[in-house]
Amino acid sequence: MPNEIFTINLNAQAIIPEAFILLGIVGTLLVDLAGEKTASKWAPIICYLSIGSSLVSLALQWSNPVENAFLGSFNSDNLAIAFRAIISLSTLISLLISWRYTEQSGSPIGEFAAIVLSATLGAMLLCGSTDLISVFISLETLSVASYLLSGYLKRDPRSSEAALKYLLVGSAAAAVYLYGSSFLYGLSGSTNLATIGLEIINKPSFITSLALVFVLSTVAFKIAAVPFHQWTPDVYEGSPTPVVAFLSVGSKTAGFAFAIRILSTTFSSFDEEWKLLFTILAILSMALGNVVALAQTSMKRMLAYSSIGQAGFVMIGIVSGTQDGLSAAVLYLAAYLFMNLGAFSCVILFSLRTGSDRILDYSGLYQKDPLITLGLSLCLLSLGGLPPMLGFFGKIYLFFAGWANHQYLLVIVGLVTSVISIYYYISVIKMMVVKEPQEASEIVKSYPEINWGIEGLPPLRIALYTCVAVTALGGILSNPLFKLANTAVSETPFLQDIIAIANNIS
């Protein structure tokens, strides 16, 4: 009988997707020990099998979610499944675009793959964590792996600088989270997020408000929201580009998953307070991210500030707190996965062929490399929210949900900053397409012959084609994707509380 109760409460099948990722970590480390030649051959295969198995197991869990696993410290509900699927896909595409880059930089492939999978493991666990301790362990697993990835190019001083900055700021964020968690535990006597929420309903004290601010600071750091964004441009510019691609989607998605869960369970009785703080963060992120991006000369720094602005758009859906708003937030993160990684695929390919990421060096690229020009143009147009791209429909759903919930200021700021973002996205496209041959940059004039047969480039080509195709076919895919996102929200029990509160307020 005791064994039966333990089995029921454990529900270990909830983390089968994470178990496959863990097996992938072990496998890549083992082949790495066998030598670089063996690792180059087998590490990608192990990663594909690991992530593919994880995605299949997530699909099987979709119709039969496992809740209350590991004695209440993990929930594999439909919302967690959706976010974990986005993270797994982002890892798969990030690895596809990284093999050639890693080989060309002379870094060990097996070791790199193991660290990326470790970050993925932490991010996926964070999506379903329902306990302060499991949240911290997941958060640190993701963070430590991210620090290692940022400084992976050991011979590049910019990479080392990026890792050090990321480590210092990330350590401060972790300390702030622990400080806030200690307040919550002291007030409730529990580490379970839902239990804490019940215990602090009748304790709207200064200490509880302080804990909310500390936890929100950690969330803002993970999603790179202003004013907790200072690390983002420098880390993005100095880190290896495939690492930046992963951090811009995987880490951000995990941060939003954590935000939705803790705000709608632990701080459900502080609905007005956290929505006000989130509104301020969203406005600052959309405004500063898109305005400062105008002045950037590096493609990676431009995309860094763009990602700050994109986080602000997602926050519109979360602040609305309605069924449509939360569904739109999930949909936009799924869309962001493809359009952002598609853009990074083009940036990596251009960097591999030229060694540059300066925006001016893209001048006249259409004449030498039409594929990169077309792919990057479509992805940038989608990020800007122009029809008929996937990003347009994602923003439409977010703005409609925000307007229906009377978040007029957020929607107006979102519309204005979207127009600003379109300007700097189209400036890059214009530079690539409109320039005459004699106006092309020196790097484009000496552009190397295109050869897709080089080892590591075929996977990058697959990733590029996939991302661009999904981004361009947004009009066809937006409705089924929104239905999936809507199902993830409607069939997640804990979200009904925050939706009910939002409906009562409206």
Curated annotation (Swiss-Prot):
Keyword field: Membrane, NAD, NADP, Plastoquinone, Quinone, Thylakoid, Translocase, Transmembrane, Transmembrane helix, Transport
Its subunit composition reads: NDH-1 can be composed of about 15 different subunits; different subcomplexes with different compositions have been identified which probably have different functions.
Q: What class of enzyme is it?
A: translocase
Name of the gene: ndhB
Tell me how this protein sits in the membrane.
Multi-pass membrane protein
Q: Which family does it belong to?
A: Belongs to the complex I subunit 2 family.
This chain belongs to the protein called NAD(P)H-quinone oxidoreductase subunit 2
Q: What does this protein do?
A: NDH-1 shuttles electrons from an unknown electron donor, via FMN and iron-sulfur (Fe-S) centers, to quinones in the respiratory and/or the photosynthetic chain. The immediate electron acceptor for the enzyme in this species is believed to be plastoquinone. Couples the redox reaction to proton translocation, and thus conserves the redox energy in a proton gradient. Cyanobacterial NDH-1 also plays a role in inorganic carbon-concentration.
What species is given as this protein's source?
A: Prochlorococcus marinus (strain AS9601)
> Which NCBIfam families does the record cross-reference, listed alphabetically?
NDH_I_N, PRK02504.1
Which stretches are transmembrane? 14-34, 42-62, 79-99, 108-128, 132-152, 167-187, 206-226, 240-260, 276-296, 302-322, 330-350, 374-394, 409-429
Q: What is the lineage of its organism?
A: Bacteria, Bacillati, Cyanobacteriota, Cyanophyceae, Synechococcales
The Gene Ontology CC terms held by the record are: plasma membrane-derived thylakoid membrane
This enzyme catalyses: a plastoquinone + NADH + (n+1) H(+)(in) = a plastoquinol + NAD(+) + n H(+)(out); a plastoquinone + NADPH + (n+1) H(+)(in) = a plastoquinol + NADP(+) + n H(+)(out)
- Where does this polypeptide localize? Cellular thylakoid membrane
Q: Which GO terms describe its biological process?
A: ATP synthesis coupled electron transport; photosynthesis, light reaction
Tell me, in one coarse class, where this protein mainly resides: membrane
**Could you cite one Gene Ontology molecular function of this protein?**
NADH dehydrogenase (ubiquinone) activity
